[in-house]
């Protein structure tokens, strides 16, 4: 399973990339706003800065909600850098735009997926990725992980090449569950990725090793 980091914060992207396990980045308008980035030119420069840090795919979202606007913005984003994947919402206009982009060889990430039916339409339109939102479904007492499982099974049965990019990951357990569900990618906040390292037995074992090493050296 690939790891993407879900942020527009350059320091966090660098930290995750320095771990040597980062495969890509996902952003959205909310994450860009959180970093105080506004205006088309500033957003474009920021996407380029992200592409300079990582080697993998970088999802950049269109703001327009109409077909023509999505096409215009998506083509501009795709022309910015080869790593850019155009992020498009799962709406009627969005599915139409994904089909256009697919025909033009422009890669897309269909976002805001909450049903298998939405994922099916995105895959048929030629999306490179679909992003089921695990945490947001859990928030309304639905089962986000089950959705991931069902999409993975459906894509496998019908042999769609679209990758399942599990999004809205809230914690480390979500990552493990997405792995077990067969997701191709999990896009996560930095603290969730780092959380995979944590276990009390690892901490206590390392402490014991270091203490034994100290005693050996003192014995010399």
Curated annotation (Swiss-Prot):
Sorted alphabetically, the Gene Ontology BP terms of this entry are:
carbohydrate metabolic process; pentose-phosphate shunt
- Superkingdom per UniProt: Bacteria
Catalytic activity, as annotated: D-sedoheptulose 7-phosphate + D-glyceraldehyde 3-phosphate = D-erythrose 4-phosphate + beta-D-fructose 6-phosphate
Entry keyword set: Cytoplasm, Pentose shunt, Schiff base, Transferase
User: What is the E.C. number?
Assistant: 2.2.1.2
**What are this entry's molecular-function GO terms?**
aldehyde-lyase activity; transaldolase activity
The pathway to which it is assigned is:
Carbohydrate degradation; pentose phosphate pathway; D-glyceraldehyde 3-phosphate and beta-D-fructose 6-phosphate from D-ribose 5-phosphate and D-xylulose 5-phosphate (non-oxidative stage): step 2/3
Task: Report the locations given in the UniProt record.
Answer: Cytoplasm
A cellular-component GO term for this protein: cytoplasm
Q: Say where the protein is mainly found.
A: cytoplasm
Tell me which family the UniProt entry assigns to this protein: Belongs to the transaldolase family. Type 3B subfamily.
Provide the protein name. Answer: Probable transaldolase
Record gene name: tal
């Amino acid at each position: 399973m690939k790891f993407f980091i879900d942020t527009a914060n350059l320091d966090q992207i660098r930290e995750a990339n320095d771990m040597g396990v980062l495969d890509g980045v996902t952003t959205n308008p909310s994450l860009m706003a959180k970093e105080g980035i506004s205006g088309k030119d500033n957003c474009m420069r920021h996407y380029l800065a992200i592409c300079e840090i990582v080697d993998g795919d970088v999802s950049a979202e269109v703001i327009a909600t109409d077909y023509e606007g999505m096409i215009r913005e998506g083509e501009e984003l795709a022309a910015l850098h080869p790593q850019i994947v155009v992020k498009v919402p799962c709406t009627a206009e969005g599915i139409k735009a994904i089909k256009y982009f697919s025909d033009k060889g422009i890669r897309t990430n269909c976002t805001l997926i909450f049903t298998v039916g939405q994922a099916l339409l995105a895959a048929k339109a030629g999306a490179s990725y679909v992003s089921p939102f695990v945490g947001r479904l859990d928030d309304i007492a639905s089962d986000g992980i089950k959705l991931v499982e069902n999409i993975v099974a459906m894509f496998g049965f019908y042999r769609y090449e679209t990758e399942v990019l599990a999004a809205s990951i809230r914690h480390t357990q979500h990552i493990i569950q997405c792995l077990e569900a067969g997701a191709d990618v999990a896009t996560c906040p930095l603290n969730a990725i780092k959380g995979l390292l944590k276990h009390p037995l690892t901490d206590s074992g390392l402490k014991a090793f270091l203490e034994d090493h100290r005693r050996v050296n003192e014995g010399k």
